Amino acid sequence: MESQQLSNYPNISHGSACASVTSKEVHTNQDPLDVSASKIQEYDKASTKANSQQTTTPASSAVPENLHHASPQPASVPPPQNGPYPQQCMMTQNQANPSGWSFYGHPSMIPYTPYQMSPMYFPPGPQSQFPQYPSSVGTPLSTPSPESGNTFTDSSSADSDMTSTKKYVRPPPMLTSPNDFPNWVKTYIKFLQNSNLGGIIPTVNGKPVRQITDDELTFLYNTFQIFAPSQFLPTWVKDILSVDYTDIMKILSKSIEKMQSDTQEANDIVTLANLQYNGSTPADAFETKVTNIIDRLNNNGIHINNKVACQLIMRGLSGEYKFLRYTRHRHLNMTVAELFLDIHAIYEEQQGSRNSKPNYRRNPSDEKNDSRSYTNTTKPKVIARNPQKTNNSKSKTARAHNVSTSNNSPSTDNDSISKSTTEPIQLNNKHDLHLGQKLTESTVNHTNHSDDELPGHLLLDSGASRTLIRSAHHIHSASSNPDINVVDAQKRNIPINAIGDLQFHFQDNTKTSIKVLHTPNIAYDLLSLNELAAVDITACFTKNVLERSDGTVLAPIVKYGDFYWVSKKYLLPSNISVPTINNVHTSESTRKYPYPFIHRMLAHANAQTIRYSLKNNTITYFNESDVDWSSAIDYQCPDCLIGKSTKHRHIKGSRLKYQNSYEPFQYLHTDIFGPVHNLPKSAPSYFISFTDETTKFRWVYPLHDRREDSILDVFTTILAFIKNQFQASVLVIQMDRGSEYTNRTLHKFLEKNGITPCYTTTADSRAHGVAERLNRTLLDDCRTQLQCSGLPNHLWFSAIEFSTIVRNSLASPKSKKSARQHAGLAGLDISTLLPFGQPVIVNDHNPNSKIHPRGIPGYALHPSRNSYGYIIYLPSLKKTVDTTNYVILQGKESRLDQFNYDALTFDEDLNRLTASYQSFIASNEIQQSDDLNIESDHDFQSDIELHPEQPRNVLSKAVSPTDSTPPSTHTEDSKRVSKTNIRAPREVDPNISESNILPSKKRSSTPQISNIESTGSGGMHKLNVPLLAPMSQSNTHESSHASKSKDFRHSDSYSENETNHTNVPISSTGGTNNKTVPQISDQETEKRIIHRSPSIDASPPENNSSHNIVPIKTPTTVSEQNTEESIIADLPLPDLPPESPTEFPDPFKELPPINSHQTNSSLGGIGDSNAYTTINSKKRSLEDNETEIKVSRDTWNTKNMRSLEPPRSKKRIHLIAAVKAVKSIKPIRTTLRYDEAITYNKDIKEKEKYIEAYHKEVNQLLKMNTWDTDKYYDRKEIDPKRVINSMFIFNRKRDGTHKARFVARGDIQHPDTYDSGMQSNTVHHYALMTSLSLALDNNYYITQLDISSAYLYADIKEELYIRPPPHLGMNDKLIRLKKSLYGLKQSGANWYETIKSYLIKQCGMEEVRGWSCVFKNSQVTICLFVDDMILFSKDLNANKKIITTLKKQYDTKIINLGESDNEIQYDILGLEIKYQRGKYMKLGMENSLTEKIPKLNVPLNPKGRKLSAPGQPGLYIDQDELEIDEDEYKEKVHEMQKLIGLASYVGYKFRFDLLYYINTLAQHILFPSRQVLDMTYELIQFMWDTRDKQLIWHKNKPTEPDNKLVAISDASYGNQPYYKSQIGNIYLLNGKVIGGKSTKASLTCTSTTEAEIHAISESVPLLNNLSHLVQELNKKPITKGLLTDSKSTISIIISNNEEKFRNRFFGTKAMRLRDEVSGNHLHVCYIETKKNIADVMTKPLPIKTFKLLTNKWIH
C-alpha cells in the first residue's frame, strides 16, 4: 500500500530518504545522551526489526550497518507527481545533507513565517508552505513495504562519493502528552542523528560541535512543529517559544541538561550499587570516588545514610578486604569514615608500609572480640582476631591483630615457624594451659575465657580447615612442636604449641576423635566442620543439630549472636597426668601474672595506675616485676570499652583553623533555647542566638514557636543585617541536628543564598560548644537579673537581651578586645545604660484627665534596638514602652555607685496592687481610687523554669504564740522602717528580725470600726473592738496587710475561714498620734478573729446597722423561713454536740507546721488540717518565704508609689508539662484476643467455654444477616479506605459467663466512611441516680432488661467492607457489611436512632428533653445504656407491656423483673444495688472491688490495721524532677493509669467521698514519683479496706409534699499549684446523695469569697438540669436550694450593689449568679462549716472530721 501511495507523487525526483554518510561523520556525530541500543523505545526496536529485512549495506561500506537507516534502492518506479509538497520545496543533495529532507521540503525555499495569533504551534493549512502529514500515510516518513519492491534512487551526484549510505530514516513518534516530552526528546535527538545532524545537537557542555546553517535550522523548526503539537508541550517549552518561536536549539539544550541530571543520578546509584575494590587502585582514589557519589546524591535529595553506604561498600570488597564485610554484625553504628580507615590500613600494608607503621590493623568493632574463619582455596587459613587496646592509648585507630603478635615486631614468615622462638616446657598437670607455650614477652596467657561470647562452647566454623583450642585440658595424645603452619586472614602466623586428639562422647553414646591444635593466641575455640565431615558428622542448621549421614542426632547446636556453637560437655577430658613434652621445666613460682588477670582483679583500673600503685607498695603481696606487662600496651578490655565508652575527644584549639580561614561574619554558630513554660501568650517561649566565629559578636532573637517559617524569618533578618551593616556575606552556619534546622524549607533557603550548613554529629553537643556555652551564659545572667531585680519572669527575654548588649561590650581575656571592637564598632557608652530593673518614673503623655498624675512608675529593662530610647516595663499598664521620657528614681547613692536595691519594697502580688477598685470597710464607708490599670493577657502567675530556688530557714527558732511585743518596740522599729523602704525579697534574709518587718508607725488616719460581728464558729459574735489590734510575736509569720494607709482598699468582708490573725498598730481617726490597743489574751484574740476577703466586699452599703455587717438572707415571711428550714432538715448532715456561745475552738491545735512546699499540690491543702475550721489564708503569701513574712504595703506607698505594681517572686515547680492538663485516662485492655483465649490458652476448661462463646457469636452474626453472604470481594477491587479490619475479642463477665464478640477496628476507620456529626448517646449517671432515687420514694418496680446483639439490629448506610479474621482463612477476600457491627464509629449512633424510633413509635414513649436515653410515658420511665434497659413503674404490668412490645422486634432478655417485695439485688451498670421497695436502697461495688483490686498488683495489707481515712491533712506532693529512665517512666505511668482509672470509676459511681483524692492524684498521672505512687497505693488500700461501704438511701417521709433538690458547695482557696483553688459540690434529691464533683477551679481566685462564688456558679447549671429532669419524671412541685458556708458569698448574691466587684471576671460571674438565683427561684442558705459535707470534696480532713461528715450517707 505504501508503494502505491508513494507512486502518486510524480513530482518528487529524489529518493525520500537516500542521503549517505561517511564513517568519519558517524564517529564525529556522537550522541550526547549516549543512548545505547538497549535503551531504544519499542517502536525503534520494531523499526530495526523491519529494516533488517531489507537490503543490507554494500560490502564496500566502511561503516557497519546502521539499523536505523535503510540502504538506497535502484529507482525502478517513477517518482510521485502529486505529493503534498511541491517540487520547488525539495533540495538537491550535493553534499551529505540530512537524510529524508525531501519529505520536509527544501529548507531554503520555506520562509520564516511567524505565527499569526501567537508564537505557538498551529496546524498549517492546505495553502501553507509548512509541511503537512500526507492524508493517506501513517507517518511522514513511512517506510515502503518490502514486498512492493518500490524504491527510490537518490539522484544526487554526491552519493557516489560516500562510503556508505543509510536506509530510510524512521521519524520520531507524535508527542501526545506533556509528561511524555522527556522521552520524546530522546527519540527526536536520535532522529536528528540518523539524519546527519548530530553535529548541531548541543553536547554535555551545552555547545554544538559545529554551527547550524539556515537550512538546517529550517529543517529543525519544521520537523519539531510536525511531531510536537503545541497543545502537548510542557510549560517551560512554551515559555521559550513565546520569546522566540524558532529557538529549537535552546529547547534541545535545556532538555539535554535535564536528562543529564537524571542520568547522573541513575548512574551514581548504579555505580554505588556495583562498587568493586580489591586494592588494585589506591585507597585514596577509591574513597574520593565513593564520597563524591554520596555527596552528589545527598545534594540531589537522595539521602544515603552511613548504614546503607557501609553495606554497599563492604559488599564490593574482595581479596584482603573481604573480611571487612562481616564487621556490620558487630558494629552497627560504623560510619563510612571508619570503614575507609580500615581499607587504608590494609592498603598500606599491601604497599609495604609495615616498617614505618605499627603492624596492627584497626579493629572493625571496638565492642566485641570476634573469631571467625573463612575458606581459602590454596591453604588452610584461620582468622583469629582479638582486638585489644589499652585504656590510656592515644592511638586513633585500633587495628585487628592476633594475640601472639607483638605491637612493634614484624610479622612472622607464613611458610615456617622459627623453632628458636619456641622452648618446650613440661606440662605439670592436666589443667596446665602452658603446654608448649612460647616464652616471649608477647605471649598472653588465656587461662580465663570469660570473654567468650558463649563460655563453655566451641564455635562452629565452616571456613576453618583445622580445629583449634586454647586449653590443653581436652587434648589427648599431645605432642609439642608440630610441623604445622597456620595463618590468619591477614596471612600472619599463629604459633601452635601442640597437636593432639579431641575426643567426643555424644548423647547417643558414640565416641569420635578428630585432630586438634593447641594455641592460646585465638579469641575462641574453633571446631572445624571440615574435620567433622571427615568422620561422617555434619551440621544441620535447619534443625540446629550435629548428626550423622544416617540422620542420627548427636548433639544440639546453639545459636548465640551471629554464630553457632556446640557445648564442651561432649568433650572428654585428657587422662594424661604429667606428660613431658621436653626436658625443660618452668617452675610455678617463676610464672608471672598476666596483665588481663590483674586488670580484672583490680576493678578494671588502667595499667599506669596499677604500676604506680605497685611501685609505691599501696598494693602488697606481689611486686611490679611479678606482672607480665608485655600486653599492657596494646591490651583492649572489652568490658572497659563497653562500660567506659565516651564520646570522641575534641582537640583543644580545633577551631583555630576556622578563625584563620574565615573573615568576620562569614562563619556563624546558632542554637535555640526553650521552651520556657507557664508564660503568657504575649511573652516569647524561645530565643535563637547567633555567634560570629571570628569576632564573637552575638545576636539574640525572641521566638514564640519553633515553626519553619518563624526560623526562616530570623535567618532572613540576620543575613540582611550582616550584609547591610557589615558588608559581609555569611558563608557557613554551624547548627545542631534539630528539626528546626534540618527542615527542607531552611535547607533550600541556605542553598539559594549560597550558605553551607554545617551540622554537628549525632549526640555530640560538645561539637556545638560555642552556641551551647553562649546560651548557658545568657541564662545564668537572666536568672541573676531576675533574682536581683525581682521583676516577673515573663520579662525573661528582656534580661537575655540586656545581657547580650553587655557581653558584646566586655573584653575577652584571650583577645584583649571586646566583640564590638572586633566588629569595628565603638565601645558601649555606660552613661546610656541603666541597671536592669532600675526604678524609673515615665511621663504619661496621654493622661486620663488633667488632674491625673503625669508620672507612671516603671522599671528599666534595656536600650532600645530601634530608637535612642529605653525599653521600660510599666506594671500598672502591664506593658513595655520605648521612650526617652523617664526620670531615674534615685536614693542617696548614685545609680552607678552601687545602687541601693534594698531601698525599694517589692511585693509579690501584681494583680492586687495595680487593680484600682471600689471597696468598703463598713456599710457607711466607701472610698474611691483612680484606676490606671488596663486589662491585658499577661498571666502574672507564670513562671520561668530555670532552676529551683532552695528554701531557707528564715527564723532561727520558733516564735512562741504567747510572746508579745511592747508598744515602744513598735514605735522605734516603725521609725526605722520609715527611713528606708524594705523590698520583700524572694528569700527572706535570715538576719531580719521581727521588729524590722513591722509596718511604719507614720500612717494616715484609719477609720475605727466598731460592732464588727465574727462568724468564726458559725454564730454571730459581736466584737466592740477596733479593726486593727496590736501584733504579737505569735503572729510575726503572718501578713500585716490588715493595716492600710489612706486608701484602705484591702479591708473586705470576713468569713470564718481565716487564720491570719492581724494585730497591728492603728491610727486614731482624727490625728497623727498613734495609739495601740492594749494587749489581750490569746483566748480573747481567738474570739475576735476578723476574717477578710480581699477582693470582693461582703458588707452591704445600704444597711448601716451594726447587726448586719455580714448579712445573711433574712426571711421576710414565715413561709420562707419554713422553706429554708425544711431544705436543711432532711439532709444527711452530721450531728454536732452543742457548744457554749462563749467557747471558741482553738484554731492552732491541729495547725500543721509551716511547710516550705506550700505551693505544691497537696492532699492537705495550705493549712487545711483543722477539724472544725477551714484554715485558708485569705492573702497570698510570698511563695519562697516559708514563714509567710509579709511587709505592709504602706511601706511601699510611703514614696508615692501607690500605683506601682511590685514584682512578684515565684519558685519553680518541677512538673512535666503534660501534668498540668490531664484530660483523660488511658483505658486498660480487659479483653482477650483470639490467640490468647483459644489458640494458646492452656486452661482447657476456659478454652472450651470461649470456643462455645465463639460459635454462639458466629451463629448470631449469621442469624442477624450481618454481611452479604452471597458474594465475596477481591481486596484489589475495593477502595482501601472502605475496608475495615475485624477481630474477635473475648472476656469473662462478672456473673461468670464467657463472652465472645466480633468487632470492627473502628480505631483505624477512615473519616470518610462515617458521619462525624452523629452521636452515640447513653444514659447519664445523674439521670440513672435520679431515677433510682425517685423509684425509692414512690415505691416503683425496677425491671432490668438486656437486648442481645443490639447493634446488629441497626442497618448501616455506608458502603463498608471488612476483612474476615485471619483464622478463617480468607485473607484475600472481603465481605460487605449490612449491619452496624460492634466497633464501627457509626454503630452506636445507628443503634440509638433505631431503638429511639421504636420506643417512640411502637411503645408510646417520649425522650426527656436535655437528657438523652431517658424515655417516659404516663406510667413507665426507661433508662437506656446501649443494650441495657432499666424500667421504672408503679405498676409492674406496665413494665411487662413494654417488654412484650420489645420482644416483637428484639431478642430481649429479662435480667431481673423486680416483682418481689423483699430485698432484690441488681447489677446495673457496675453498681451492685440492694433494693427493698418502700424502705431503702443501698448502692455499692463490693464484689467488683474484691475481684479487681487484687489484680492491680498493689501491695495490700489485708490482715493489718485498716485505714480510717484516704489521706492525711498537711501532706504535700514534692514535685522535684524525676530521675528515672524512659522504660521505668512508661511503666509507672501505665501503673498510675490503671490505679487512677479504677478509682475514678468507683468514685464517680458512688464513692463521692474519695473524689478530692482521685482528682488530685489524677493530675499527677504523668508525674509518677515515689511519693505519688505511695499516695495512690494508700488510696487503693483505703478502697480495699472500705470495699463493703455502701451509699445508703432511705425513703423520703410521706408527709413531704414537694421534691427537694439541693446542691451543697464548698471551696478551698489557693490550695493547688499556681494559686488555684479546689471546688466541690454535692447534689441531693430528697435528702439522698445522688452525685458529687471535685475539681480545680479554672480561674485563679484572689480570696475565699471568689472561690466560693466560683464553686456555687459551677453547681447551678447542673442543678437546673436536674430540676427539669425531676419535674419531667415526677410531677410533684420541686424546691431548689443552694447551701454554702460562706456568709460573704450569700451577701453578694442577695445584694443589689454592683460596686462590690473589683474583678470583672468574678463580677460577671457573680452578676450572672444573682440572675440565676432570682430567675430559677433558688433558695440560698447558710450551712455551718462543721456540717458542710461538701468539705470532703475540697481538702483532706482529719479522721474524726472525715468520719463525722460522711458516716450519715455512706457506711
UniProtKB/Swiss-Prot annotation:
Cellular component GO terms held in the UniProt record: cytoplasm; nucleus
Residues covered by region (Disordered): 1-88, 126-173, 352-421, 956-1087, 1092-1111, 1130-1171
InterPro entries: Aspartic_peptidase_AS (IPR001969), DNA/RNA_pol_sf (IPR043502), Integrase_cat-core (IPR001584), Retrotran_Ty1/copia-like (IPR039537), RNaseH-like_sf (IPR012337), RNaseH_sf (IPR036397), RVT_2 (IPR013103), TYA (IPR015820)
Keyword DNA-binding: yes
Entry text on domains: The C-terminal RNA-binding region of CA is sufficient for all its nucleocapsid-like chaperone activities. Integrase core domain contains the D-x(n)-D-x(35)-E motif, named for the phylogenetically conserved glutamic acid and aspartic acid residues and the invariant 35 amino acid spacing between the second and third acidic residues. Each acidic residue of the D,D(35)E motif is independently essential for the 3'-processing and strand transfer activities of purified integrase protein.
Ranges where the Reverse transcriptase Ty1/copia-type domain occurs: 1338-1476
Residues annotated as the enzyme's active site: D461 (for protease activity)
Region (Integrase-type zinc finger-like): 583-640
Comp. bias intervals (Low complexity): 153-165, 402-418, 960-969
GO BP terms in the entry: DNA integration; DNA recombination; proteolysis; transposition; viral translational frameshifting
Residues annotated as binding Mg(2+) 1: D671, D736
Taxonomic lineage: Eukaryota, Fungi, Dikarya, Ascomycota, Saccharomycotina
Compositionally biased spans, kind Basic and acidic residues: 1038-1053
Organism expressing this protein natively: Saccharomyces cerevisiae (strain ATCC 204508 / S288c)
Region RNA-binding: start-end pairs: 299-401
SUPFAM superfamilies to which the protein is assigned, alphabetical: DNA/RNA polymerases, Ribonuclease H-like
Domain of life: Eukaryota
Identification of the protein by name: Transposon Ty1-ML1 Gag-Pol polyprotein
Extent of Polar residues compositional bias: 1-23, 48-60, 127-152, 1005-1015, 1054-1082, 1101-1111
Binding positions for Mg(2+) 2 per the UniProt entry: D1346, D1427, D1428
Role this protein plays: Capsid protein (CA) is the structural component of the virus-like particle (VLP), forming the shell that encapsulates the retrotransposons dimeric RNA genome. The particles are assembled from trimer-clustered units and there are holes in the capsid shells that allow for the diffusion of macromolecules. CA also has nucleocapsid-like chaperone activity, promoting primer tRNA(i)-Met annealing to the multipartite primer-binding site (PBS), dimerization of Ty1 RNA and initiation of reverse transcription.
Residue(s) at site: Cleavage: H401, N402, N582, N583, A1217, A1218
Disulfide pattern: none
